[in-house]
């Protein structure tokens, strides 16, 4: 997503450069070597020659803020008021810790900048305790004239008070703030005493040792385990001092981290930031302390603080923080939607702030840092879609890349998470196999059905798990293949050909085609399959799913029409049509669809714990089938058409075929001309398998998933197509990689790091890249062939409800469908997406208009006698996208309208759906 232009950035910089900053010019830098040598009552090490602290640019920077308060016994102490770790975290009045985005006032940032400009900056102080730091700090404040010598002991005793951490009984919300008073009896005037009447004066007593509250004992170790070993902390101390005339700030950077145990987390302290000042109505120390802690928690400023050699560099880092900040004008915000425009502006500012200083800028935007070494060439050489220009070169590279890791594929499977994934993927693969098997039997009149599809899925999944280069792929039947089977079956019926024998010859040509494509490294053509083509394909399949569901329902109503009156003579035999069948079929189909859709949406709701919701949502389809089949089972007096499943390893239609299909024909000789014409339908099948398999491999191989064993575009395609070609010889369906099931499989095997750090996104620890989960799923699906006593009770209307569910839900992740909906929305309700904000509205409608025209053309071909040619028309969308659309849209518009911006989701939050990542039909 592109950010705002340069004008916006310049305006932001000018607004953050007020005249009040001019007093920073000519200010001195105070170094640790300028400490007063009279400090002799503490253990200080020799400072030596000062060198900049080693660069520790860790992502985590822990900051803890302590305020001076009076505890329940009216004793002064330092109380933890908040902590910063990515986000600001503070204890709410109810006693619970809550994290939120730190929001700062503009005035507090100005005051902080002035304080840094005039305050004390001590760099690389050689002190091994916070007490030593306090002595050095006070001596420097007196040396620079910011603290009177008679106040030294008062401030020192305050800095050495014990530190406590909040609990339900004691926190900054329940305890009064304390104020430093001078011990020599100096008093304020009457107005100041009236102003401070609610604050108790601190009775100066030096308390050694750090207090430890229950919250520290419980939370500290838990949070510490989530942080890297090299994390260092910043301690911010804020107190109100009545004897000071103006605020003072002192920043101390230690030469070596101090291990004093005053923090809630056992971390060494590298920075100590102290803010002291008089209580004044024009100064809000609450906001200043939050601003100071937020700045110290900033990743870039922390790097500058580690590396700075003086005050000027530190102020430069603070200036960079201000330039990247956003200021809201003091006016009422009409609605929260208007605040959404801040998100891209803030992201752009953060991206520029985190940008590597060596990055080369060009008119087209930032480019990668210059690197002529070998490290930059390694990823390119390992690109699985890089041409080797040798016959079968890509296949050889896939084998050399993956097969040496075969033993690790077995070892990595010895994990409980893999067993859980097996159970989950089994049901995820079984439900569509039963659904498509029942529908395939309907479309082909029993030539292939549930038993053939289950056996084909089992055998091919087993072989693929053993031999593939990417065993995370789940092989199965899909909607596009079902559409082709129906079209080819009608073609064979119209021309008097044996459908099951024609598939054998298609299988032979499939094997030759895939060998030719793999030999020529044709799989690299997947680079040209943009979102434009994928969404046309997905939208067409979704429409076919929805249309076929209602077409089947209409057929049921025609076979069993409703009657306006019924014969009450019970002695007569009932007629063949059964009017209740149509109504019950409608109820079963609609009930299955809405129940499955509800369970999918329930997965992203806020009810029940997240694990329970995801479990229910992931098993939504089998739950829906079970519930509606159970309802049909208890309705005894109404007939519904059931799923036809043979017993054991029998074929669906034993009278028409066997397990081996003779290539020359069984009932009649197969025409020779059709043997040589079979390359045409074979090419169509190959296009469908190629599209689904290669796009699925691309999705699962995204860098965000952090797979380390590589993928195999060439080897996996060869295995899937070759196994499908051989399966046709036994009268079984050919299969392809299934997108939704593959993503589900990969997510189930992904170990996502659980972090207690507020604001930190879930990160991948590892992915269990192994072969046994797919192998066990294949075995379980094969055993499911023996489930005939259970499967025979499933009504076909229930399967058509699942068919409708797949068609409707496939539209949710298609941006083409979203753009069609934009035509019905007023512009003010349009989403803040790049293709909406960067492209004019009338041009947004032009892109889906061309896609709709192509879909209409494909639909016309589908319903015509030339329905087999649909994949050919689909392939023509590739040159259409690359040759015609650039003449209609500009380059930036095409990038917005035709980019793969699907976010990889490993753990869904409320309102998110992992299947929106998928742009292919399932």
Swiss-Prot record:
A single BP term in Gene Ontology: regulation of intracellular pH
InterPro entries referenced in this protein's UniProt entry, alphabetically: Anion_exchange, Anion_exchange_1, Anion_exchange_CS, Band3_cytoplasmic_dom, HCO3_transpt-like_TM_dom, HCO3_transpt_euk, PTrfase/Anion_transptr
Keywords: Anion exchange, Cell membrane, Glycoprotein, Ion transport, Membrane, Transmembrane, Transmembrane helix, Transport
Gene Ontology MF, one: chloride:bicarbonate antiporter activity
Glycosylation sites: 653
Extracellular topological domain: 441-448, 490-498, 555-581, 635-674
Extent of Polar residues compositional bias: 27-36
Regions crossing the membrane: 417-440, 449-469, 473-489, 499-519, 532-554, 582-602, 614-634, 675-695, 712-730, 731-748, 772-792, 793-811
Gene3D superfamilies the UniProt entry points to: Helical hairpin bin (1.10.287.570), Mannitol-specific EII, Chain A (3.40.930.10)
Catalytic reactions of this protein: hydrogencarbonate(in) + chloride(out) = hydrogencarbonate(out) + chloride(in)
SUPFAM superfamilies in alphabetical order: Phoshotransferase/anion transport protein
Chain positions covered by the region annotation Disordered: 1-36, 355-389
Tissue spec. comment: Erythrocytes.
Membrane topology: Multi-pass membrane protein
Listed Pfam families: Band_3_cyto (PF07565), HCO3_cotransp (PF00955)
Primary location recorded for the protein, binned into one broad class: membrane
Regions of this protein lying in the Cytoplasmic compartment: 1-416, 470-472, 520-531, 603-613, 696-711, 749-771, 812-849, 881-922
GO CC annotation, single: plasma membrane
Compositional bias per record (Basic and acidic residues), positions renumbered to this chain: 10-26
Subcellular location: Cell membrane; Basolateral cell membrane
Residues in the bilayer without spanning it: 850-880
SUBUNIT field: A dimer in solution, it spans the membrane asymmetrically and appears to be tetrameric.
Its biological purpose: Functions both as a transporter that mediates electroneutral anion exchange across the cell membrane and as a structural protein. Major integral membrane glycoprotein of the erythrocyte membrane; required for normal flexibility and stability of the erythrocyte membrane and for normal erythrocyte shape via the interactions of its cytoplasmic domain with cytoskeletal proteins, glycolytic enzymes, and hemoglobin. Functions as a transporter that mediates the 1:1 exchange of inorganic anions across the erythrocyte membrane.
Homology family: Belongs to the anion exchanger (TC 2.A.31) family.
Name of the protein in its database record: Band 3 anion transport protein
Taxonomic placement: Eukaryota, Metazoa, Chordata, Craniata, Vertebrata
UniProt gene name: SLC4A1
């Amino acid at each position: 997503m592109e950010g705002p232009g340069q004008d916006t950035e310049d305006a932001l910089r000018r607004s953050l450069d007020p005249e009040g900053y001019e007093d920073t010019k000519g200010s001195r830098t105070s170094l640790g070597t300028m400490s007063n040598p009279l400090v002799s009552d503490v253990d200080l090490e020799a400072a030596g020659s000062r060198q900049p602290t080693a660069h520790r640019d860790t992502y985590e920077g822990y900051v803890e803020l302590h305020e001076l308060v009076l505890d329940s016994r009216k004793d002064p102490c330092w109380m933890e008021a908040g902590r910063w770790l990515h986000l600001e975290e503070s204890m709410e009045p109810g006693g619970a810790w809550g994290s939120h985005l730190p929001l700062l006032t503009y005035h507090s940032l100005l005051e902080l900048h002035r304080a840094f400009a005039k305050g004390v900056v001590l760099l690389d102080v050689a002190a091994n305790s916070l007490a030593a730091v306090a002595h050095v700090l006070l001596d420097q404040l007196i040396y620079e004239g910011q603290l009177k010598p008679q106040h030294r002991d008062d401030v020192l005793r305050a800095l050495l008070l014990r530190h406590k951490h909040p609990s339900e009984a004691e926190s900054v919300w329940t305890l009064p703030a304390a104020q430093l008073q001078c011990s020599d009896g100096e008093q304020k005037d009457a107005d100041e005493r009236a102003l401070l009447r609610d604050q108790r004066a601190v009775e100066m007593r030096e308390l050694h040792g750090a207090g430890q509250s229950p919250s520290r004992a419980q939370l500290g170790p838990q949070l510490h385990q989530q942080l890297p070993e090299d994390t260092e902390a910043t301690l911010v101390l804020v107190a109100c001092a009545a004897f000071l005339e103006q605020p003072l700030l002192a920043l101390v950077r230690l030469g070596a981290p101090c291990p004093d145990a005053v923090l809630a987390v056992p971390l060494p302290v590298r920075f100590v930031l102290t803010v002291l000042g008089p209580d004044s109505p024009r100064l809000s120390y609450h906001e200043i302390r939050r601003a100071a802690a937020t700045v110290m928690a900033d990743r870039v400023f922390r790097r500058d603080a580690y590396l700075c050699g003086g005050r000027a560099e530190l102020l430069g880092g603070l200036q960079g923080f201000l330039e990247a900040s956003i200021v809201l004008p003091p006016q009422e915000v009409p609605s929260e939607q208007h605040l959404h425009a801040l998100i891209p502006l803030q992201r752009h500012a953060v991206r520029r702030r985190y940008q590597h200083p060596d990055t080369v800028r060009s008119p087209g935007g930032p480019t990668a840092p210059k690197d002529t070494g070998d490290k930059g060439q390694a990823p390119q050489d390992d690109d699985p879609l890089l041409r080797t220009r040798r016959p079968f070169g890509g296949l050889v590279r896939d084998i050399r890349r993956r097969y040496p890791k075969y033993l690790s594929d077995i070892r990595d499977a010895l994990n409980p998470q893999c067993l859980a994934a097996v159970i989950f993927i089994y049901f995820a693969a079984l439900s569509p196999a039963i659904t498509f098997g029942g529908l395939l039997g309907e479309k082909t009149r029993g030539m292939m059905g549930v038993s053939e599809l289950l056996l084909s899925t089992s055998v091919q999944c087993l072989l693929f798990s053993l031999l593939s280069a990417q065993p995370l792929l789940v092989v199965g039947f899909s909607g596009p293949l079902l559409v082709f089977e129906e079209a080819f079956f009608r073609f064979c019926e119209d021309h008097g050909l044996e459908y099951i024998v024609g598939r054998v010859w298609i299988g032979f040509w499939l094997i030759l085609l895939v060998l030719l494509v793999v030999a020529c490294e044709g799989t690299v053509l997947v680079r040209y399959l943009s979102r434009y083509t994928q969404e046309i394909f997905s939208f067409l399949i979704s429409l076919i799913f929805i249309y076929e569901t209602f077409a089947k329902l209409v057929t049921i109503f025609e076979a069993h029409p409703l009657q306006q009156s019924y014969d009450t003579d019970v002695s007569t035999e009932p007629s063949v049509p059964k009017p209740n069948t149509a109504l019950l079929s409608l109820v079963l189909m609609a009930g299955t669809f809405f129940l499955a859709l509800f369970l999918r949406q329930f997965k992203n709701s806020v009810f029940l714990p997240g694990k329970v919701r995801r479990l229910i949502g992931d098993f939504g389809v089998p739950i829906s089938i079970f519930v509606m089949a159970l309802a049909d089972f208890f309705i005894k007096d109404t007939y519904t058409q059931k799923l036809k499943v043979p017993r054991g390893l029998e074929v669906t239609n034993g009278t028409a075929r066997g397990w081996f299909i003779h290539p020359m024909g069984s009932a009649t000789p197969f025409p020779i001309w059709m043997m040589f014409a079979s390359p045409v339908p074979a090419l169509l099948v190959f296009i469908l398998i190629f599209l689904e398999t290669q796009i699925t491999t691309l999705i699962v191989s995204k860098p965000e998933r952090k797979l380390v064993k590589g993928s195999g575009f060439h080897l996996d395609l060869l295995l899937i197509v070759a196994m499908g070609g051989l399966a046709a010889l036994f009268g079984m369906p050919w299969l392809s990689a299934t997108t939704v099931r593959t993503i589900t499989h990969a997510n189930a095997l992904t170990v996502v790091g659980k972090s207690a750090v507020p604001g930190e996104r879930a990160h991948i620890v590892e992915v269990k890249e192994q072969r046994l989960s797919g192998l066990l799923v294949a075995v379980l699906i094969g055993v499911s062939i023996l489930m005939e006593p259970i499967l025979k009770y499933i009504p076909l209307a229930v399967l058509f409800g699942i068919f409708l569910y797949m068609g409707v839900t496939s539209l949710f992740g298609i941006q083409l469908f979203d753009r069609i909906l934009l035509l019905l929305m007023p512009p003010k309700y349009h989403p803040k997406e790049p293709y909406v904000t960067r492209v004019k509205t009338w041009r947004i409608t032009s892109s889906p208009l061309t896609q709709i025209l192509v879909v209409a053309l494909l639909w016309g071909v589908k319903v015509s006698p030339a329905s087999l040619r649909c994949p050919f028309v689909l392939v023509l969308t590739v040159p259409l996208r690359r040759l015609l659309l650039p003449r209609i849209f500009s380059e930036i518009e095409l990038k917005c309208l035709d980019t793969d911006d699907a976010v990889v989701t490993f753990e869904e939050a409320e309102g998110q759906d992992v299947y929106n990542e998928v742009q292919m039909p399932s």
